[in-house]
C-alpha cells in the first residue's frame, strides 16, 4: 500500500479540524515553524501542507501576519472582462447605497481620471460616494476604512498604500466577506477582487522598447517603498525583457531609494525631500556615466530624473521612459510611457463592487488593457 506523504497527512488533519470547526473562520493557524515542531517534520514539509490548504481555498496567507481560515471558496482566476459584459445580476437594495473609496493619493499623472470615472459610474449605478485619502500611511488607511464602515457604507474600493504587509482592517473585510474591490495594487493571497493593469506585461513591453532601440545600460528607478505587488510585477517584467535578450539586468545601475514621490513624504516634507532626492540622483548619474537610458516606474519619478539630466546637459543623450503621464488634452507626451486605462479601471471597479453588494461573492481579477504611448517631440520643447 502506497504511503501518504507527510505533508498530505498534515494537510488532511488541519482540513478536518477546519471542517469540524476546530478552527473557525478568522482563526490564525500555527506558523510553518510551529507546525514543523508540532509534527516533527521539516519547514519544507509544513510549508507544502499550508500551500495545499491555500490552493483549496480554505486559508489565506497574509505576509507579515500569518495564515488565516476563510470560508471555503474557489481560488480567484485572472480574467480580462470587457465593460459591456458586466451585466446586472440582482436588484440593489431599496435605499440608495453609499460606497467608500480609499486612495493612497491621486494626481494628474495617475488617479484623477480613475477617480472621475468611479464617481460617474457611481451615478450610473445609483450610488453615493465617500472619499478618503491615506496619503501613503497605513494607519490612515486603517482609520479611513473603519470610519467608512462605521458610517454604514455598503462596500469599499481601495488603492492600498505602498507596503508589503496588509492592514488588519483589509483582512477583516476579506474574512467577513464585506464587499471590497482593490484597484491598481492587488493583494496576493487575499480573496479580494482586483481591477488594474497587467504590470508585468506592460513593464516587459516598455523595457523591450528601449532594448529594441539598442539601449543596454538602463537605470531602473523606483521609490523607496516596500515591494508592493505593483512594484514587484514591474521589476519582474523589466528583468524578463532583459532575459529574453540574453542579457543581465544590472541592479547596481538602479536607483531605488527616492522618497519625494511617496504620498507621505510629498505631503509632509515637500520641496525639502525633492531637493535631497535630486542631489542624490545627480550624484548617481555622475558616478555611472555608462548609463544610457532611464526606466521610471512612475511619471513623477521620470520628471525628477529628467530635471537632473537637464541640469547636467544629458537630456538629449539619455531617453527616459515611464509608467503613466500627465493628463494632456492634446495628447502630447513628454516621455514614452505605459498609458493605463484609468477610466476603464474606475468604472469596472464600481461594477464589480455593485455585483458584490447584490450578493455575487465570486472573487475576480480583471486586467484592463494598456498601450505604449510614444513621446511627442513638441512636448519636450
Q: Model regions: which residues?
A:
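An alpha-beta-alpha
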Residues: 206-248, 362-379
Amino acid at each position: 500500500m502506497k504511503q501518504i506523504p507527510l505533508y498530505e497527512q498534515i494537510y488532511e488533519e488541519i482540513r478536518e479540524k477546519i471542517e469540524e470547526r476546530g478552527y473557525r473562520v478568522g482563526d490564525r493557524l500555527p506558523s510553518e515553524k510551529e507546525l514543523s515542531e508540532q509534527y516533527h517534520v521539516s519547514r519544507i514539509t509544513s510549508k507544502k501542507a499550508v500551500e495545499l490548504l491555500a490552493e483549496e481555498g480554505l486559508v489565506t496567507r497574509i505576509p507579515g501576519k500569518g495564515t488565516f481560515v476563510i470560508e471555503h471558496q474557489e481560488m480567484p482566476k485572472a480574467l480580462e472582462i470587457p465593460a459591456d459584459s458586466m451585466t446586472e445580476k440582482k436588484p440593489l437594495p431599496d435605499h440608495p447605497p453609499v460606497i467608500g473609496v480609499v486612495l493612497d493619493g491621486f494626481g494628474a499623472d495617475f488617479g484623477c481620471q480613475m477617480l472621475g470615472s468611479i464617481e460617474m459610474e457611481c451615478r450610473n449605478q445609483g450610488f453615493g460616494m465617500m472619499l478618503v485619502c491615506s496619503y501613503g500611511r497605513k494607519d490612515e488607511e486603517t482609520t479611513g476604512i473603519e470610519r467608512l464602515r462605521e458610517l454604514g457604507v455598503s462596500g469599499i474600493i481601495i488603492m492600498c498604500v505602498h507596503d508589503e504587509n496588509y492592514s488588519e482592517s483589509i483582512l477583516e473585510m476579506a474574512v467577513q466577506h464585506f464587499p471590497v474591490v482593490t484597484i491598481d495594487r492587488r493583494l496576493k493571497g487575499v480573496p479580494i477582487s482586483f481591477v488594474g493593469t497587467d504590470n508585468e506585461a506592460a513593464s516587459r513591453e516598455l523595457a523591450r522598447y528601449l532594448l529594441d532601440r539598442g539601449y543596454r545600460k538602463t537605470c531602473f528607478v523606483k521609490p523607496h517603498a516596500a515591494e508592493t505587488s505593483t512594484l514587484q510585477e514591474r521589476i519582474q517584467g523589466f528583468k524578463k525583457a532583459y532575459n529574453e535578450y540574453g542579457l543581465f539586468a544590472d541592479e547596481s545601475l538602479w536607483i531605488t531609494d527616492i522618497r519625494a514621490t511617496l504620498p507621505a513624504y510629498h505631503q509632509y516634507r515637500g520641496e525639502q525631500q525633492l531637493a535631497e532626492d535630486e542631489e542624490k540622483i545627480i550624484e548617481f548619474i555622475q558616478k555611472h556615466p555608462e548609463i544610457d537610458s532611464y526606466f521610471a516606474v512612475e511619471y513623477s519619478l521620470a520628471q525628477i530624473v529628467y530635471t537632473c539630466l537637464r541640469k547636467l546637459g544629458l537630456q538629449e543623450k539619455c531617453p527616459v521612459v515611464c509608467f503613466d503621464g500627465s493628463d494632456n488634452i492634446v495628447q502630447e507626451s513628454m516621455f514614452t510611457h505605459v498609458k493605463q486605462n484609468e477610466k476603464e479601471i474606475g468604472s469596472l471597479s464600481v461594477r464589480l463592487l455593485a455585483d458584490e453588494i447584490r450578493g455575487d461573492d465570486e472573487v475576480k481579477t480583471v486586467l484592463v488593457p494598456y498601450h505604449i504611448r510614444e513621446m511627442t517631440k513638441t512636448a519636450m520643447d
